[in-house]
Curated annotation (Swiss-Prot):
Full protein name: NADH-quinone oxidoreductase subunit N 1
Gene Ontology MF term list: NADH dehydrogenase (ubiquinone) activity; NADH:ubiquinone reductase (non-electrogenic) activity; quinone binding
Species this protein is from: Acidobacterium capsulatum (strain ATCC 51196 / DSM 11244 / BCRC 80197 / JCM 7670 / NBRC 15755 / NCIMB 13165 / 161)
GO biological process, one term: ATP synthesis coupled electron transport
Primary role: NDH-1 shuttles electrons from NADH, via FMN and iron-sulfur (Fe-S) centers, to quinones in the respiratory chain. The immediate electron acceptor for the enzyme in this species is believed to be ubiquinone. Couples the redox reaction to proton translocation (for every two electrons transferred, four hydrogen ions are translocated across the cytoplasmic membrane), and thus conserves the redox energy in a proton gradient.
Pfam family, one: Proton_antipo_M
A GO-annotated cellular component: plasma membrane
Protein family according to the UniProt entry: Belongs to the complex I subunit 2 family.
Subunit: NDH-1 is composed of 14 different subunits. Subunits NuoA, H, J, K, L, M, N constitute the membrane sector of the complex.
Lineage of the species this protein comes from: Bacteria, Pseudomonadati, Acidobacteriota, Terriglobia, Terriglobales
InterPro entries the UniProt entry points to: NADH-Q_OxRdtase_suN/2 (IPR010096), ND/Mrp_TM (IPR001750)
Keyword NAD appears in the UniProt entry: yes
Length: 515
């Protein structure tokens, strides 16, 4: 990607967002035209097509010059394009899983696919925003969509309850984020992310800016399910449809992490001595609370909800590195976690059904005997979540912890390694159940034949996780390209004043170990 500020084709800089918007509108228009009990699966395939086009448009954006559009509000660079591809891919696979999960006569599922598309628009806007107000707009678009998706099963007792809890706590976190933007504007006179960094060098209201940054971090910590702002996560995951949980647990987190990286490294690098200790504490709490909480769970979705809290902590470990390696490690881990989590929820969605007939770890006994394919895929994703070599999870954790160690965060890396050991126990508990013969008195586990949509979703997630574990170089190279986005002007100027950033030419690079 060539550096520049060309705005010759502004629409190309938001082409994936346009495609998802059109997809959502078309799905909403077509949905009422279907007979009451007709299958809405064609609308799901339409969403898959939209996600494919958005994915292709995102890859096309790699050929655009670095620059902004619409008066500096939208920014296209290697970092934003990397997360565009990730989020579009997550929506693609989630739509395939949903097509498999919904019953042919299920009503109103057209709205479910439309909400996926509209939520993707908000997440994509967050990742390419160069303006805090656009981040807020994208955050609200994605949040409203996920609130509704979380409570989409209206006949479920837990669905509406979890959605209301998610909405109330989410609104509270959004208020923190918005108030943080207001305080930042009061301290710097701007809400443009690159301009904030320059304004802080001459600002006389730095304490106000510190408070503003703290509020922004609190709002984003809620969105990524980081402790102690994680209380909504287990209930929301348990009450939402399983295909939706695969989307909820990955895409909004990826978007929020992208925003967190951009704000911390591009807008507030001079405050690294404030936000690094804060993120250190949040990372340690998230890993510990998430893994210890998962040990106590018998419900599979609640167990994976606590697991997602722990993985948010692993991602935050990379944030504290203050180096291109840390940013690249966080970006790589986001891809790895997305592939693993969407894949495992695809299996859970098919086994448990749209209505979650089977929810407990014991219910999965005999899965490998009833369906060797689903049992094998479940085992593969569990091993990857543990971090077994030749899986994406191994390299993801290796890059995160090595970045922390190289930056001197040795104790945080040790805490992460200890928590990775704790996680082995609850992942193996589900793995053991999958390959155990059920007792005669147990509920007979029945699984329907996987549909083409599910097989395609499983192939994409398994292949991605496997390739990331064997050939991580290409994805890591793209992640490093995005990381160096933050080391271009004007951040080089900030680096000379604050001593925060190293010269990209002399920065250490992550090297792949031999598994």
């Amino acid at each position: 990607m060539i550096q520049g500020m060309t705005d010759t084709y502004p629409l190309l800089r938001i082409l994936p967002e346009i495609i998802f918007t059109i997809t959502g509108v078309v799905v909403m228009v077509l949905e009422p035209l279907f007979p009451k009990h007709a299958s809405r699966k064609p609308l799901g395939w339409l969403t898959v097509l939209g996600a494919l086009l958005a994915l292709a448009a995102s890859f096309y954006q790699y050929g655009l010059p670095i620059g902004t559009a619409y008066f500096g509000v939208v920014q296209t660079d290697a970092f934003s394009v990397f997360f565009h591809i990730l989020i579009s891919g997550i929506v693609l696979v989630s739509a395939l899983v949903t097509i498999d999960a919904i019953k042919p006569d299920t009503e109103n599922t057209g709205e479910l696919f439309a909400l996926m598309a509209f939520g993707a628009v908000g997440m994509l806007l967050m990742t390419c925003a160069a303006e805090l107000l656009l981040v807020f707009i994208g955050l609200e678009i994605s949040s409203i969509a996920t609130y509704i998706l979380a409570g989409f099963r209206r006949r479920s007792a837990k669905g509406p309850e979890s959605a209301i809890k998610y909405f109330l706590l989410g609104s509270f976190a959004t208020a923190f984020f918005l108030y943080g933007i207001a305080l930042t504007y009061g301290a710097t006179g701007t809400t443009n992310i690159p301009d904030i960094a320059a304004a802080l060098l001459t600002s006389h209201a730095l304490p106000l800016a510190v408070v503003g940054l703290s509020f922004i971090l609190i709002g984003l910590a809620f969105k990524v399910s980081a402790a102690p702002f994680h209380l909504w996560t287990p209930d929301a995951y348990e009450g939402a449809p399983s295909p939706v949980v695969g989307l909820m647990s990955t895409a909004p987190k990826a978007a929020a992490f992208a925003v967190l990286l951009r704000i911390a490294y591009e807008a507030f690098p001079v405050f690294h001595f404030h936000w690094v200790p804060l993120l250190w504490i949040i990372a340690a709490l998230s890993m510990t609370i998430g893994n210890l909480g998962a040990l106590r769970q018998r419900n599979v979705k609640r167990m994976l909800a606590y697991s997602s809290i722990a993985h948010a902590g692993y991602l935050l470990v990379a944030f504290t590195a203050l180096s291109p390696d840390g940013i690249a490690a966080a970006s790589f881990y986001a891809v790895t976690y997305a592939a693993m989590n969407v894949g495992i929820f695809a299996v859970i969605s098919h086994v448990g059904g749209y209505d979650d007939r089977l929810t407990l770890v014991e219910d999965y006994k005999g899965l490998a005997y009833r369906s060797p394919l689903l049992g094998g895929v479940m085992a593969f994703f569990l091993l990857s979540l543990i971090g077994i070599p030749f899986t994406g999870g191994f390299f993801g954790k290796f890059y995160v912890f090595s970045a922390a160690i190289h930056s001197g965060m040795i104790w945080l890396a040790i805490i992460g390694l200890i928590n990775s050991g704790i996680a082995v126990f609850y992942y193996l508990r589900l793995l053991t159940a999958t390959y155990s013969k059920p007792a005669e008195s147990a509920l007979v586990l029945t699984t329907g034949r996987p549909s083409f949509a599910l097989l395609l979703a499983l192939f994409l997630t398994v292949a991605t996780t496997l390739l990331l574990g064997i050939f991580p170089g290409s994805v890591l190279a793209r992640a490093q390209e995005g990381a160096y986005t933050f080391y271009r002007a004007p951040l080089v100027i900030l680096g000379t004043h604050a001593g925060v950033f190293a010269d990209p030419a002399t920065a250490k690079s992550i090297t792949s170990p031999t598994p």
